[in-house]
Each structure stands twice: as C-alpha cells, then as structure tokens.
C-alpha cells in the first residue's frame, strides 16, 4: 500500500467509525474492550480514553513503562489539534516532507505516530480521543480501529490497514 492508500483508508475509517451518541458509559465500554483485546493477546499497552480534556478510562498492562504514558499524551494531543488520527497526521507530514516543528509545534508535546483516534459523534465532530501506546505505530492504530469497529458493528476487514 502507498502512503495515499493508507491516508484514504484512514479517512474512510474516521468517517465510518463515528458514533450516534457517546457518553461516559460508552467511553468506559470502549476502554474495557481495548483492555480485554490487549489482555487476550498479551499486549503490553497503555490505553486511554479522554472526552474533551477529561480522562475517562486508563489502563496500563504488563510491559508498559512511563514512556508509554508520555506517548499517549503526545499522540492524543495530535488528535485534539487536528481532529484526525495521529497516524493520519504523521503520514500526511511524511508525504509533505514536514515535521510537527514545521507547523510550530513541539515534538515534546506532539507525536505524529499511530495509536490515537478521534472519537467522532455524527453531527457534532470530534469530542475526544482513544489512544493506545506500546506496539509499533501501525499496530497501535489497528488495535484502536478494531475496537471501534467491534463497538459499532462495522466490517473490520474493509476498514483495517493492510500489513506493511
């Protein structure tokens, strides 16, 4: 797959993986689903669900370090800045030959790497972010997409990014 293929697929994901409504209970269910998927697969990941600026769900599974906590924050900042997945933002920067610093942002606070995805509500837009850190960035992204697809009863096979 090319960069453009990935960017197009992620745009499709961001459109399809939108909720009719999303509240604190839904946020908890999403976080718990990610925690269950990661636990079943023995994945050492940090999981965060944040609505607006309020943390709603957080889990650190065996293997997570304080560094992952910082990655979660930095990836989530990308979603809150651009209202799109951190992976899409990173791929777009790569395509354009730019860095976050070229956009006046600090790499200490913004990580254009896969793993954070906007929580979109139809008719409203981005109200939060769901973030995973601990795997290679494409795998972090795909894990979040899988959980969202399961919650929304969407066909994961048509949404998942192909392996590199």
UniProtKB/Swiss-Prot annotation:
Pfam families: HbpS-like. Belongs to the UPF0303 family. NCBIfam families: PRK02487.1-5. This is UPF0303 protein RHECIAT_CH0003058.
């Amino acid at each position: 797959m090319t960069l453009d293929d990935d960017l197009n697929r992620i745009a499709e994901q961001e459109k399809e993986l939108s909720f009719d409504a999303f509240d604190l209970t839904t946020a908890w269910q999403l976080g718990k689903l990610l925690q269950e998927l990661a636990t079943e697969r023995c994945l050492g990941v940090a999981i965060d669900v944040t609505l607006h600026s309020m943390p709603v769900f957080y889990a650190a599974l065996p293997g997570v370090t304080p560094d992952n906590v910082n990655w979660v924050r930095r990836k989530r900042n990308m979603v809150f800045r651009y209202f799109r997945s951190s992976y899409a933002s990173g791929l777009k920067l790569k395509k354009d030959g730019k860095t976050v610093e070229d956009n006046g942002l600090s790499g200490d606070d913004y990580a254009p790497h896969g793993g954070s995805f906007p929580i979109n509500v139809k008719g409203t837009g981005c109200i939060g972010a769901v973030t995973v850190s601990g795997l290679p960035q494409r795998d972090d992204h795909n894990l979040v997409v899988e959980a969202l697809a399961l919650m929304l009863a969407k066909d994961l096979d048509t949404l998942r990014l192909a392996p590199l």
